Each structure stands twice: as structure tokens, then as C-alpha cells.
From Swiss-Prot:
Catalytic activity: ATP + H2O = ADP + phosphate + H(+)
Main location: virion
Protein name: Helicase VP6-A
Oligomer status and interactors: Homohexamer.
Length: 301
């Protein structure tokens, strides 16, 4: 910037001899060139003033003076359509969005427990609230989560109830709309009817419930968050338990019994015989992973 100022000032120094020559020529009394000499002098003075102004802008001090670097940045900001200011936030207004601002729910307690146990994510159970976003766990994912037949049947029943309710409400809205139109026709006000039909907004075609079928674990995790838990095998470290059996013949030497859904049709007979012993302890599973709870019980014993 200093070199540029010196070169400009040098240019200004070169202009001055021309002004002196023009002044001398005018003093010699050349009438034919006096007018043109004055025009040249005024143009040179304007050029000198422009040079002085640029030099002052470059090397001056104070709040009104700006260097080339700052001025260049301003020009870039004005010319760029994406950046609105030198200190503005380019990413302003960009944020993460959820699924219609709502949370996904499931239809049964068993499915909610299975998801929390496997992925560590707590998910609510649908309680007839509207609007709602419901996850329908389909067959392949049911096996992955270990959902029982009873749990599958419960989900199916609730889905049927929801669809039946939606269908009945849709029919009710259509019937109500038909009654309104019929009433208007009876009064013979056809013109008013057409005007009001244009002004009346369409009624919603659903009850605000979204049902999303999910077959894969990947899609489920993308909807609810969480990661699959890699469960380490649980084994008995040291226990006095020598035998685990569901045979009625082993009740005689048993010291504890544990009831859980295993598919054994004779479990009631075994439990009945075991309960007759006074020195036997009874344990039961109320939910969760039966295998894990049973192994924890063995560790406890």
C-alpha cells in the first residue's frame, strides 16, 4: 500500500509541470489556446483530487478509513448470494427434524419389553391416544424379538380394532356430509349450497393414526434409536444346583422349582407335586428373557 501511494503521489508530481506550462502559455497571451488550456487545467485538477482522495482512503486513519483487505471482504459478501453477511451463520435455520414431531409406539407390553431388553430403548405402548404413530411388528421381526404366540395374537387384535374404528368413523363422516347436502336441497337453496361447499374445507379422511409395518431390525432401529445389545453368555459361576429337570420323578430330591412358559403340557402336575414338599422354594418368571432369569436364579441358589 505504501508503494502504491508513492507511485500515485509520483504521478501527481508529474502532473504539476504540465499545469505550470499551461499557466506560462496563458501568460504569453496566446488567445486561441487559452480556453483549451483552462479546460485541460480543470480536468487535471479533478484527476489530482481523485488521486488525493484514493491516497487518503488507503493510508488514512480513523473509523472512516478501511484497508484493501476489509474492502475486498465486503465486496465478496455483497456478491455472494449464499452469504448474507461477514459474520453471519451460514447454517442458520438448518436443523434436525423428527417424524412429524411425534414418537413411535407399539401395541403390546410384551413387544415394548422385548425392544427394551434387546436394544436398550424404552418405547411406550399405545393407549388409544390420537394422533399416534404405531409400529406394527411383522413376522420376521417377531421371531428376532422372541415374541410369543400370545403377544402376536394381541397385536393382531388391536390392529383389527383400530382399523374397524377408522372405518366406522369414515362412514360416519360420509353419512353426516350426505345429510347436510340433503337438508340444503330440501330448502331449495342450490346457489347457496354451491357457495358454501366451496367455502367449507374438506374433512380429514383418517383419525390421525399412522400404522407402519416393520420387518427388519435396521428399520426398527432407525425409527426408535438405540443399538443391538451384544449379550455375553450367562453361565453359573458356582452353584449347589446339580440337576435341572422337568420330570415328576425328580420332585423327591428337589429343593426349589421355577415356573416359566416352556411349552411343557405336564408342568402343572410337576408343580402340584413339588408344592407338597415343605422344604421346597418356589420361583416364577413374570416377564423378560426366561433363560437369563433362570440362569440368574441358579447363580443365586
Amino acid at each position: 500500500m505504501i508503494d502504491w501511494a508513492e507511485s500515485e503521489s509520483g504521478k501527481g508530481d508529474k502532473v504539476e509541470p504540465k499545469e505550470e506550462n499551461e499557466a506560462e502559455e496563458s501568460k504569453d497571451g496566446e488567445g486561441t489556446q487559452s480556453e483549451s488550456g483552462q479546460k485541460k487545467e480543470s480536468s487535471k485538477e479533478a484527476e489530482d483530487a481523485d488521486v488525493d482522495r484514493r491516497v487518503h482512503t488507503t493510508v488514512g486513519s480513523g473509523s472512516g478509513a478501511k484497508g484493501f483487505r476489509e474492502r475486498a471482504n465486503e465486496n465478496v459478501d455483497r456478491g455472494d448470494g449464499k452469504v448474507c453477511g461477514g459474520v453471519g451463520d451460514v447454517d442458520a435455520g438448518v436443523g434436525t427434524t423428527g417424524t412429524n414431531g411425534g414418537r413411535w409406539v407399539v401395541l403390546t407390553e410384551e413387544i415394548a419389553r422385548a425392544i427394551e431388553s434387546k436394544y436398550g430403548t424404552k418405547i411406550d405402548v399405545y393407549r388409544d391416544e390420537v394422533p399416534a404413530q404405531i409400529i406394527e411388528v411383522e413376522r420376521s421381526l417377531q421371531k428376532e424379538l422372541g415374541i410369543s404366540r400370545e403377544g402376536v395374537a394381541e397385536q393382531t387384535e388391536r390392529l383389527r380394532d383400530l382399523r374397524r374404528k377408522e372405518k366406522s368413523e369414515t362412514h360416519a363422516r360420509v353419512a353426516e356430509k350426505g345429510r347436510r347436502k340433503q337438508g340444503k336441497r330440501v330448502h331449495g337453496d342450490a346457489q347457496k349450497e354451491s357457495t358454501e361447499d366451496e367455502k367449507t374445507p374438506e374433512e380429514p379422511t383418517s383419525v390421525g393414526i399412522t400404522i407402519e409395518g416393520v420387518m427388519s431390525q435396521k428399520k426398527l432401529l432407525s425409527m426408535i434409536g438405540g443399538v443391538e445389545r451384544k449379550m455375553a453368555p450367562i453361565g453359573a459361576r458356582e452353584s449347589a444346583v446339580m440337576l435341572v429337570s422337568n420330570s415328576i420323578k425328580d420332585v423327591v430330591r428337589a429343593t426349589a422349582y421355577f415356573t416359566a412358559p416352556t411349552g411343557d403340557p405336564h408342568w402343572k402336575e410337576v408343580a402340584r407335586e413339588a408344592s407338597k414338599k415343605k422344604n421346597i422354594l418356589a420361583y416364577t418368571s413374570t416377564g423378560g428373557d426366561v433363560k437369563t432369569e433362570f440362569l440368574h436364579l441358579i447363580d443365586h441358589l
